[in-house]
């Protein structure tokens, strides 16, 4: 089925060419399985990452609405906030970020290095809060305050994860299908599942482009019971935007994010070290390290549907390594 309705949505061009899809020979030998990686960690802006795909659509909508300020939220070490700030700088917009400290640490490295350091370079107006308990409401309240100061704010949800932003990962599914055509018959795709937009967009795109390929989301912050409704809701919202059906089952693995969001674990850090030492590729302790731990364990536990090639979606996040230095 065609995804031609994607072209109806205004989109800014931040990425340019498709990101590389690479074979990992040494990692594949180590695991005894063909492993490929989609390098969304090397998107052009602000040290790379997946959120730029979403921001191509979201920032276009902000400009269409005449906004002069991007307002968003996340953790102190949020990759999404960093990339939103870079987009704002590139477009000459103001950026206001509502940040929380999800792990409750007072470690200076976490509070000032990594992504947080980059926010200062991008001249972001940072507002701290105790917790993002109801981020949509908190962002609306912040936008109201910003508007009262004479700005024209555009609210971007946590992770850029709404139906419009998730279109960026329908676009990514198109790239993946084109890059694999005639070259590799993917059995499975593995992605970190957090704010759910990346996962949902891929789910819609892959269902229509590579229907025999299973998509597995490795949760980084929630149990399956809590995460699945979020992914399904976005999956259906994206499908409605594109006037498509979305019947693919959402598969999630939740055994790899403990002790909680933003706190590294041993398996995740081992995955970070393994890929660095075998392939010279940097994962991160919060998202991709834990997702890769799921991939590694999934192979050893025979959780994948067959023995075919696996594609890992590298969503970026390496700047956080510097903030988590004692764990690395």
From Swiss-Prot:
HAMAP family on file: D_Cys_desulfhydr
A UniProt-annotated Pfam family: PALP
Native species: Escherichia fergusonii (strain ATCC 35469 / DSM 13698 / CCUG 18766 / IAM 14443 / JCM 21226 / LMG 7866 / NBRC 102419 / NCTC 12128 / CDC 0568-73)
Annotated keywords: Lyase, Pyridoxal phosphate
Modified residues (N6-(pyridoxal phosphate)lysine): 51
Known role: Catalyzes the alpha,beta-elimination reaction of D-cysteine and of several D-cysteine derivatives. It could be a defense mechanism against D-cysteine.
Lineage: Bacteria, Pseudomonadati, Pseudomonadota, Gammaproteobacteria, Enterobacterales
Reactions accelerated catalytically: D-cysteine + H2O = hydrogen sulfide + pyruvate + NH4(+) + H(+)
Protein name per its UniProtKB record: D-cysteine desulfhydrase
InterPro entries in the record: ACCD_DCysDesulf, D-Cys_desShydrase, D_Cys_desulphydr_bac, TrpB-like_PALP, TrpB-like_PALP_sf
């Amino acid at each position: 089925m065609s995804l031609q309705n994607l072209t109806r949505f205004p989109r800014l061009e931040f990425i340019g060419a498709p990101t590389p899809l690479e074979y990992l020979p040494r990692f594949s030998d180590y695991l005894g399985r063909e492993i490929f990686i989609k390098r969304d960690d090397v998107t052009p802006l602000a040290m790379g990452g997946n959120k730029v795909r979403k921001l191509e659509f979201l920032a276009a909508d902000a400009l269409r609405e005449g906004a002069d300020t991007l307002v968003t939220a996340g953790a102190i070490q949020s990759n999404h906030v960093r990339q939103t700030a870079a987009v704002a700088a590139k477009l000459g917009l103001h950026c206001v970020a509502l940040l929380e400290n999800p792990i409750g640490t007072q470690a200076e490295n976490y509070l000032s290095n990594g992504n947080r350091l980059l926010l200062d370079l991008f001249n972001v107006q940072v507002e701290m809060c105790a917790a993002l308990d109801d981020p949509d409401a908190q962002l609306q309240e912040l936008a109201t305050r910003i508007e009262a100061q004479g700005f024209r704010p555009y609210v971007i949800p946590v992770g850029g994860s709404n139906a419009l932003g998730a279109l960026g990962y329908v676009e990514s599914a198109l790239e993946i299908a084109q890059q694999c055509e005639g070259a590799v018959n993917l059995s499975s795709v593995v992605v970190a599942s957090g704010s759910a937009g990346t996962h949902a967009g891929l789910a819609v795109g892959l269902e229509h482009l590579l229907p025999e390929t299973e998509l597995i989301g490795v949760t980084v912050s929630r149990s399956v019971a809590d995460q699945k409704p979020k992914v399904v809701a976005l999956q259906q919202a994206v499908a409605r935007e594109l006037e498509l059906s979305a019947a693919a089952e959402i598969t999630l693995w939740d055994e790899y994010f403990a002790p909680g969001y933003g706190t590294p674990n041993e398996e995740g850090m081992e995955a970070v070290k393994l890929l660095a030492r075998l392939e010279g590729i940097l994962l991160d302790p919060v998202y991709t390290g834990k997702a890769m731990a799921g991939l590694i364990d999934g192979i050893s536990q025979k959780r994948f549907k067959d023995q075919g090639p696996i594609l890992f979606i590298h969503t970026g996040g390496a700047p956080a390594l510097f903030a988590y230095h004692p764990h690395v």
